[in-house]
Each structure stands twice: as structure tokens, then as C-alpha cells.
Amino acid sequence: MGRIQRNKIKVEIKKLSHGKDLPLPCYATMQSAGMDLYAALGNSIVLNPLERLLIPTGIVIVIPNGFEGQIRPRSGLAAKYGITVLNSPGTIDSDYRGEVKVCLINLSNQPYEIKRGDRIAQILIAPVFRVIWDDAERLCTEETERSAGGFGSSGR
């Protein structure tokens, strides 16, 4: 399973047959938080405006207990082409053992072609804290600057 070493964690990964020739997820720079995921498509596909598709990555990962995988958009795809991860961030639970797939949506008014090997999203491995609910009759209602305000209450 996973082993933590100085802000690093080992995660088991297996390339599926349709992803054998693709790179493993990797960091673009030394300070990148996320690792790029690649489209493991047989043929190019077109993502039409307002269409969503589940894109295979050709990998299976074993995330250690106490961690999760987060699938996030690539900023360049979102800013330049309106392509983003629909359920962002997508969560990969530590007990999931299927292929990592990315649900992309095209929010632009132009079709977008996705080719085999395109970098389509990024994955982060992050710690997860288990919540223990404290069912309280009375909550701490100490006044705060925000109080019960939400949904735009702090200004534009």
C-alpha cells in the first residue's frame, strides 16, 4: 500500500492494456500540485458544446486508507477552450479499484477534439479526515464577522 516519506506517498498504479503506451501521471514542474492525466482513447473523439463524456485514462490506482484522489480541471483547457471536469473536484475513494475516468464537459460554443494522449485533467492525492459528529443541543453561537450570511453576503 502507501508509504509516506517527507511529503511523498507511494501509490500503487497499474496500466491497463489500452493505456500501456501512455506516460504515468506526472508533475509538469517541481512545484506542481497536480499530476497530468492522459486520455486513453482508441480514436479521437469530439466533445460538442454542452456535451459531457467519460474519458478513460488507462490506469487503476490503489490509494492508501486515509487519502483520496482528487480529479481537477487543467486551467489551460478551461481558460482557452471551456473544457472542464464536470464534478470538480471528482473524488476517488481509497476503496475504489476501477479505472480512473474523467467526466469532461464542453462549456464553450465550439466542438473540441480530444486525441489519444492528450492531457485532460490532473490528479492530486490528499489526506482525508474522518468526521466524528458531536450532536449538540446548542451550538456555539458566538458572533462572527460573517454570522449566518452566505451566498454573496461578503460582497462581489
Swiss-Prot record:
Xref: HAMAP family: dUTPase_bact
Involved pathway(s): Pyrimidine metabolism; dUMP biosynthesis; dUMP from dCTP (dUTP route): step 2/2
Uppermost EC category: hydrolase
Species this protein is from: Wolbachia sp. subsp. Brugia malayi (strain TRS)
Gene designation: dut
UniProt keyword Metal-binding present: yes
SUPFAM superfamilies, per the entry: dUTPase-like
Keyword terms of this UniProt record: Hydrolase, Magnesium, Metal-binding, Nucleotide metabolism
Gene Ontology MF term list: dUTP diphosphatase activity; magnesium ion binding
Reactions that this protein is recorded to catalyse: dUTP + H2O = dUMP + diphosphate + H(+)
One Pfam family cited in the UniProt record for this chain: dUTPase
Keyword Transport: no
EC annotation from Swiss-Prot or TrEMBL: 3.6.1.23
Family designation: Belongs to the dUTPase family.
UniProt cofactor(s): Mg(2+)
Role of this protein: This enzyme is involved in nucleotide metabolism: it produces dUMP, the immediate precursor of thymidine nucleotides and it decreases the intracellular concentration of dUTP so that uracil cannot be incorporated into DNA.
Alphabetical list of InterPro entries matching this protein: dUTPase, dUTPase-like, dUTPase-like_sf, dUTPase_trimeric
Sites where the protein binds substrate: 74-76, 87, 91-93, 101
BP terms from Gene Ontology: dUMP biosynthetic process; dUTP catabolic process
Protein name in the entry: Deoxyuridine 5'-triphosphate nucleotidohydrolase
Domain of life: Bacteria
